[in-house]
Design a protein with these regions (language model features):
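Extracellular/luminal Protease-associated
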Residues: 27-28, 34-50
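N-terminal basic/disordered segments at the start of proteins
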Residues: 1-24, 29
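Short, well-ordered alpha-helix to beta-strand connector turns
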Residues: 14, 21, 36-37, 58-59
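A short alpha-helix capping/helix-coil boundary motif
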Residues: 29-32, 165-167
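Active-site helix-to-loop segments that bind/position phosphate- or nucleotide-bearing substrates
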Residues: 4-9, 14-15, 57, 65, ...
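Short hydrophobic alpha-helical runs that function as membrane-insertion/retention elements
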Residues: 25, 39-41, 60-66, 70
Length: 305
C-alpha cells in the first residue's frame, strides 16, 4: 500500500529547512517525512546534510527549482540494490531484438493512454490512435509514435490554436513541461533504485543526455499529466501558479484503480522493477502500464498486456 500523500511546495519559502527525528522543521511548523511524497525546494531555501540524509532514509524525492518555480535538478540517493552491477551489465548487453520489442510495448501503451485521454476529454480521433497502436512494429521503424502525436495534439485543445512545443513559454506548454519534469524526476529516482543505469537507453539517444532511459520509461505516464493540464484549463487556470504546480505534482498520488491503493508513484516503481527483470532475461515480454480515467480519481493507470 502506498500511504504517502503529501507534496510540499517550498518554492516560496525563505529560510532554513532542518531535519530531526523523522520530521522536517520549516519555520515554526514541523512535517513528518513519513507522510511526504515529494518536495519542491525554491531558490530562497537553504538546508544541510540532515535534510539530505532524511530524504534518503524515508525515500522522499526532492526537486530544486529556479526563480520561476520550475525544477532544474533533483536530489536522489545512490542505489542500494544488490543487483546494480548485474543490471548495468545486462543493460549494456541487451540484444537489439529485445530492446526493440520493449520499445514497441512502450509506444503501444503510450498511444493507448493518449486515446484514453482523448476519450476522457470528449475529444475526437481516439479510435484512430488505437488503430495506430495496433500497427506498431518492433522498434517502431515507421514512427507510429510520431503519427499518433500529430493526431493527438491536433485533437487536444481544438479551437485554441495550441501547438505542442517543448521550448515554448506559453501557458499550456509551460504546464505540460512542468508536469513532465516532475514525472521525469520520479522515474529517475525509481530507475536508480531498481539498480539500473539511467544512461543506457532503449530509444532516446543524445550524447549530452545522462537520463535517456528515464525519457524512455516515462512515455506511458505522459497522458496522466496531459489530462491534469486539461482539467486545470477547464477550471479556468490561465497561468502556471502555485495551485497549478501543486495539482501537477499531485498526479503522482493518483490512484491506479477504484479498488486498489496503488498510485502513479508506486506504478512507476513497479514498472522500473519489471524493466530491470526484463533486461536480465527474467521476463519474456515487458508489461507496460496504460493510463485510463478512473471513476474515483482524475486519472488512473492499469496494467498493460
Amino acid at each position: 500500500m502506498d500511504t504517502k500523500r503529501r507534496v510540499l511546495d517550498l518554492t516560496g519559502y525563505r529560510g532554513y529547512i532542518s531535519y530531526e527525528r523523522g520530521r522536517l522543521k520549516i519555520g515554526e511548523r514541523t512535517v513528518p517525512l513519513a507522510e511526504v511524497d515529494f518536495i519542491l525546494l525554491g531558490q530562497k531555501c537553504s538546508w544541510g546534510y540532515g535534510l539530505v540524509a532524511g530524504l534518503e532514509r524515508f525515500d522522499v524525492a526532492a526537486a530544486v527549482c529556479d526563480w520561476r518555480g520550475v525544477p532544474i535538478s533533483a536530489l536522489y540517493h545512490w542505489s542500494s540494490n544488490t543487483r546494480v552491477f548485474a543490471r548495468h551489465e545486462a543493460q549494456a548487453d541487451l540484444s537489439l531484438p529485445r530492446a526493440k520489442n520493449a520499445w514497441k510495448q512502450i509506444i503501444k501503451a503510450k498511444l493507448r493512454g493518449q486515446a484514453n485521454a482523448l476519450d476522457a476529454m470528449h475529444r475526437p480521433h481516439a479510435e484512430q490512435i488505437r488503430t495506430l497502436a495496433r500497427t506498431v512494429k518492433s522498434g517502431d521503424p515507421t514512427n507510429i509514435e510520431g503519427q499518433g502525436a500529430r493526431v493527438y495534439w491536433s485533437s487536444y485543445l481544438p479551437g485554441r490554436g495550441f501547438r505542442r512545443d517543448q521550448v515554448s513559454d506559453d501557458v499550456v506548454n509551460g504546464m505540460l513541461n512542468y508536469g513532465y519534469t516532475i514525472l521525469r524526476g520520479r522515474v529517475l529516482t525509481r530507475v536508480i533504485s531498481a539498480g539500473l543505469s539511467p544512461t543506457l537507453s532503449l530509444f532516446h539517444r543524445n550524447r549530452s543526455n545522462a537520463f535517456a532511459l528515464v525519457d524512455d520509461l516515462m512515455e506511458p505516464f505522459r497522458p496522466a499529466v496531459d489530462y491534469m493540464v486539461y482539467r486545470l484549463l477547464q477550471g479556468g487556470s490561465s497561468e502556471l501558479g502555485s495551485e497549478e504546480k501543486t495539482a501537477l505534482v499531485s498526479v503522482l498520488a493518483e490512484k491506479v484503480s477504484d479498488n486498489q491503493d496503488f498510485t502513479v508513484r508506486s506504478v512507476i516503481e513497479n514498472f522500473c522493477s519489471e524493466f530491470a527483470l526484463y533486461v536480465e532475461g527474467k521476463r519474456d515480454t515487458l508489461k507496460v502500464p496504460i493510463w485510463k480515467l478512473s471513476m474515483s480519481e482524475p486519472g488512473a493507470l492499469k496494467e498493460g498486456e
